């Protein structure tokens, strides 16, 4: 009801003010403001409550006294401010109520979770002594340590196949290197100058033009071989030449094939002399001389660097070498 009265008073004041402004728009507006402003301030400080019991009497008689009444709604504006702090203050303590169940609920399950802690120590404690039982087979595993000295007895047995190493090296050397270095083998055999009846056969089989072709092929194949395998390649040429001469020697059976040497080399107490015949080394020194002949021929003919490791002839060739000659 108070708000309705205030609104009606405001409406009347606005209509009266607009009527006064329309009557004298030039000078009455300032005059009304000067008179109404102190009048509006006085009832606020002196008697703001006296106007509440007599709002109806002021409508027809005193329109000027009704003008200060529009400022009365300032008091009700302050009144709604009171419920704002009062209303939210009540729910704030209400929100504190749900805080009680939060500590109450988790406190109960925490002691409940402590119950499964009991089976954890009980269960693993029993299997731990059970796992100690497989420690008994460990000494059983120590029993096979006895056959370890037995294979030591077999260790000298693999030393026996070392004698057959040339047989194992043959399939490795022959398909890979000897096939590539067949021209080198042929040129070394051709450079040896046979005598008597065989000389005519060599001249027919290996003409001089083919000799140059084989020399070029030999140098090309030897240059394509990596430096790490050049030593093995030269040894393979030695091996292939020796095997071929052995086969020829078995086939001819009595035909003397003279393989003269271009140089007179002193090897220990013995010597290799031109026209002496097939070289059949029976000492490591003679075998070393044959190897040196091949090492001097191939690198000088093809201008290929030979590593110093090739100066050592391996033992497996000693049982195979029958003889070799060349320039």
From Swiss-Prot:
* Alphabetized GO MF terms: molecular condensate scaffold activity; nutrient reservoir activity
Q: Does the keyword Ribosomal protein apply?
A: no
Keyword Signal tagged? yes
Q: Where is the composition biased (Pro residues)?
A: 82-91, 100-109, 118-127
Mind telling me which InterPro entries this protein's record contains?
Bifun_inhib/LTP/seed_sf, Bifunc_inhib/LTP/seed_store, Glia_glutenin
- Pfam families noted in UniProt: Gliadin
Q: Tell me the protein family, please.
A: Belongs to the gliadin/glutenin family.
Q: What does this protein do?
A: Gliadin is the major seed storage protein in wheat.
Task: Give additional notes from the record.
Answer: The gamma-gliadins can be divided into 3 homology classes. Sequence divergence between the classes is due to single-base substitutions and to duplications or deletions within or near direct repeats.
Q: What is this protein called?
A: Gamma-gliadin
Gene source species: Triticum aestivum
């Amino acid at each position: 009801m108070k708000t309705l009265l205030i609104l009606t008073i405001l409406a009347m004041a606005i209509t009266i003010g607009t009527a006064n402004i329309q009557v004298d728009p030039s000078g009455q507006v300032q005059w009304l403001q000067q008179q109404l402003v102190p009048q509006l301030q006085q009832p606020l400080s002196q008697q703001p409550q006296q106007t509440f019991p007599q709002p109806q009497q002021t409508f027809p008689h005193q329109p000027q006294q009704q003008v200060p009444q529009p400022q009365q709604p300032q008091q009700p504006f302050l009144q709604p401010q009171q419920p704002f702090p009062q209303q939210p203050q009540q729910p704030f303590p209400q929100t504190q109520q749900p805080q009680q169940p939060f500590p109450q609920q988790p406190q109960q399950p925490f002691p409940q979770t402590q119950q499964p802690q009991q089976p954890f120590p009980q269960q693993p404690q029993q299997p731990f002594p059970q796992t100690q039982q497989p420690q008994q087979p460990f000494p059983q595993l120590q029993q096979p340590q006895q056959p370890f000295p037995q294979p030591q007895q077999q260790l000298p047995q693999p030393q026996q196949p070392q004698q057959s190493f040339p047989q194992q090296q043959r399939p490795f050397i022959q398909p890979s290197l000897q096939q590539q270095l067949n021209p080198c083998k042929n040129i070394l055999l051709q450079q040896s100058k046979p005598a008597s009846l065989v000389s005519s056969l060599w001249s027919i089989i290996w003409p001089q033009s083919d000799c140059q072709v084989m020399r070029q092929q030999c140098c090309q194949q030897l240059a394509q071989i990596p430096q790490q395998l050049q030593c093995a390649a030269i040894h393979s040429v030695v091996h292939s030449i020796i095997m071929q001469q052995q086969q020829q020697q078995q086939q001819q059976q009595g035909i003397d094939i003279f393989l003269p040497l271009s140089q007179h080399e002193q090897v220990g107490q013995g010597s290799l002399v031109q026209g002496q015949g097939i070289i059949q080394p029976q000492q490591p020194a003679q075998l070393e001389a044959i190897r040196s002949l091949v090492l001097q021929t191939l690198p000088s003919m093809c201008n290929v660097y030979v590593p110093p490791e090739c100066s050592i002839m391996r033992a497996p060739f000693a049982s195979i070498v029958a003889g070799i000659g060349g320039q």
